[in-house]
Amino acid sequence: EWSVQIGAFDTQESSTAALKSAAKKLPRSYVMATKPQIVKAKSNSGTVYRARFSGLTRQKAIEGCRILKNCIVLSNTE
């Protein structure tokens, strides 16, 4: 399973807003096939909320990142 991470944010609200904004740039069928996800994580500067579209194949994750441009593709082990 692969994911597209669109950013890491200081608040859960910012992460949710980023997912909604990114979803508007992607084809509806693409968004419907994903699992939007917010992953809470610790960083050196405190807590961050990582906004991701998960549940993708590697190829679909790459396609999504090509559309969004400012993102990273992750395998489920990352």
Predicted regions and their residues:
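Short structural boundary motif marking the start of a folded domain
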Residues: 1-3
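Local beta-strand/beta-hairpin segments that build beta-sheet-rich folds
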Residues: 6-7
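Extracytoplasmic
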Residues: 10-78
